[in-house]
Every structure is written in C-alpha cells, then in structure tokens.
Amino acid sequence: RLQWDLYNIPHHCSYLSLSDVKGERETEPKPLVKELLLHGKPDAYLVSSSNPIPDLKESYSQEQPPHIQARKAYKRYLKEVSGREFLVTMEEPNANKPEPLIFEITDGGVSWKRSTSIGAPSIVTSRPPRAG
C-alpha cells in the first residue's frame, strides 16, 4: 500500500478534493479519499499551497478555496495517523511575510526546516525520530 510522509493538498485546500459536499463545520471525505488520508505515516506533513485559512465565522460560507471545512478534515486525519504538522504556504513563518517551505528528505524520513524571522536569521529543524 502507498504510504506518504509529505502530502501536497490538491486544489488549494478546496473541499472538492475531498467530497462533493463542503459540510457545515468539516468536510467528510469520500471513502477512497479517506483511505488515502489514513495511509499517512507517523510524523507526516500535510501542505496546503494556498492563502491563509483562518477559522473565522465568515470563513465557513466562503465559496472559493481555501475552505476551513477542508482544513479541519485534513487536520483530523493527520492527527489520526500521528502526523506532525499541517502547513499552509502563505502562513509560514507568518501570514505577513510568508517564505518558502523547505523540507529535507533522507533515509530517516522527512523533516521541515522551519524558518524564523525573529532577530537574526536561523533555521530550526524538526526531525522525526529514527527507528532502529
């Protein structure tokens, strides 16, 4: 079976990549999409190439992606597989000054090199534990 460490969320975090129905608070994925989401490995990352996805009252009626209902679904399934992080490209390191996401892929897994814009430039590495 296919398992993933890094999943690029399709269509800018639109509910239509999960289901035909947005859902009031959270999108319920179709069975095969749910199966794919449940094949995430522990410490996996989900990445939404999209604008920020705020959890505000008006976000729930938004027609164009990104959709907060889809974000909630992705985050729920990431938690179910003990995933590490849900990232939105235009929110990192902050929504005012987003920067590219950089991942390192090694035989030990995938790690996100977190960029911080506080004080002097620095890199904080988030590495999954290596088994064995």
Predicted regions and their residues:
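Metal-dependent phosphodiesterase/nuclease catalytic metal-binding core
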Residues: 1-42
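C-terminal regulatory/interaction regions
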Residues: 23-24, 34, 39-45, 49-132
